[in-house]
């Protein structure tokens, strides 16, 4: 089934059993496949198109949302840490967490008068390709999903102005009686950087109720630290762990 999906994506009409080749990472495999797609003019050569295509490929290998959620619950029955260990590894294996790109970040520690600081220079996000910028300028504006932290991103094919999410599988959570989602960041700034977001696209603010929500999250995931960036003008309502 997976083979046939990939053959369809790559416009292949026949298949021959290949010789076994070892790769060092999923990035090497995807780069080779995407290079083939560019060579055969299946997609244009640009950073955005390459990301759209490699995410589409990994979506084929990603379990259905109910399967991923069931596995998380199974692990959670052992311990919250076992559940997040599994989910983070799964997010790396399906390339939602871009492990290879995150490794490019420059990190170091600095002993300041206020304590030890972790400093990061983010080099993991690819540079904007001029071809993508020009194409996005002329692209039809759409409002679905409403933002990059909406539950509707699950399985979304993506556009030149909105990243593909075929390999995204958020874990449903109930926080303060409302439905929320839990996922890792594709480009984490720190270890197991994750996000908890409201299932509804609504503005958030810092008030007394927020602290109750933060405590709910730490009750469910006691080995994580959580904070809120809700009032920041460039950030939609979410909690960072």
Where are the predicted features?
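A short acidic-Thr-Gly-centered motif at the start of a beta-strand
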Residues: 174, 216-220, 231-232
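Histidine-centered divalent-metal-coordination microenvironment in nucleic-acid enzymes
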Residues: 193, 198, 228-241
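Long, well-ordered alpha-helical scaffolding segments within enzyme catalytic domains
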Residues: 206-223
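Active-site microenvironments that recognize anionic phosphate/pyrophosphate groups
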Residues: 1-208
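Beta-sheet entry/capping signal
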Residues: 179, 223-226
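Short C-terminal domain-edge/linker segments immediately following a structured domain
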Residues: 148-154, 212-215, 226-228
